[in-house]
Amino acid sequence: MISRVDDLGVVVLLLAALVHALPLLGVLGGDQLQKLYAVQTDEPTLLLLLRHRAVLFAVLAAVFVYCAMSPSLRSVGLSMVLVCTASFVLLAQLGGDAMNPALKRVFWVDVILVSLSASVLLIQVGARVLGAKA
C-alpha cells in the first residue's frame, strides 16, 4: 500500500508538471495566449504579465518533476501543487462569473489536481500518524 501511495504521489506530481508546462506556449505571444485562455491580449502590459506567468508556470513544472524524482521532496511538491491549484480554485470562486469556457476548463483541471494532491497528502499523514512510512 505504501509504495502505491508513493507511486500515486509521483503520478500526481508529473500530471501537475504537465498541466503547468502547457502555458509555456504563451511565451510565444498573444495568439498562443488567446488559444490557451480565450482572452484578448491587445494591451502590452497584460501580454507581458501573461507571458511572464507562462515562464513561472514552466519553472513550477520543473520543480514538480524534480520533486517527483526525489522521494524526500514528494510531500513538499504535493503541498506546492495543492497551494498553487487551490489558490486558483478559490480565486475563481470569489470572482463569480469572471470565467470564460477556457478558464472554466482550467478551473476543473485544478479542482482535480487539488483533490488528488490533497488525497495523497492525507494518506501520507495518516500513514505517519499510524506509524507506517508513507
Where do the PLM segments sit?
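Hydrophobic alpha-helical membrane segments
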Residues: 57, 77-91, 115
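Membrane-helix boundary connector in multi-pass membrane proteins
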Residues: 90-107, 126
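Membrane-water interface at the C-terminal end of transmembrane alpha helices
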Residues: 115-134
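Individual transmembrane alpha-helices with interfacial aromatic-anchor signatures
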Residues: 50-51, 101-116
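Interfacial segments of alpha-helical transmembrane regions
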Residues: 2-17, 66-81
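Physicochemical signature of membrane-embedded alpha-helices that form the seven-helix bundle of GPCRs
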Residues: 12-15, 56, 77-80, 105, ...
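Interfacial loop at the N-terminal end of multi-pass membrane proteins
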Residues: 6, 26-51, 94-101
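Core segments of alpha-helical transmembrane spans in multipass integral membrane proteins
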Residues: 18-27, 42-66, 82-86
